[in-house]
Amino acid sequence: MPKLSAAELRQLSGEELRNKVRELKEELFGLRFQSATGQLENTARLREVRKDIARVYTVLQERNLNIVDDPDSTKEA
């Protein structure tokens, strides 16, 4: 899975972002389990997933603080 960019994340709806966080957390759990059992080959993926989760939370917080417009609320007629 490639790195998620903030610009791509800003195009997603709030529900899609929450689903993305859930998926990433599940992946992180699996990676941590593999790491603990010594089966993890790509250790850099742990860091990538943690940073992706932080990016999603940042976009959600920007919307909560009205720093950027929510694509759900700016539907044009």
From Swiss-Prot:
HAMAP family: Ribosomal_uL29. Signal peptide: none annotated. The keyword Endoplasmic reticulum does not apply. This is Large ribosomal subunit protein uL29. One of its GO terms (biological process) is translation. It comes from Cutibacterium acnes (strain DSM 16379 / KPA171202). It comes from the Bacteria. Keywords: Ribonucleoprotein, Ribosomal protein. The keyword RNA-binding does not apply. Transmembrane segments: none annotated. GO terms for molecular function: structural constituent of ribosome. Pfam families: Ribosomal_L29. InterPro entries: Ribosomal_protein_uL29, Ribosomal_uL29, Ribosomal_uL29_CS, Ribosomal_uL29_sf. Belongs to the universal ribosomal protein uL29 family. One of its GO terms (cellular component) is cytosolic large ribosomal subunit.
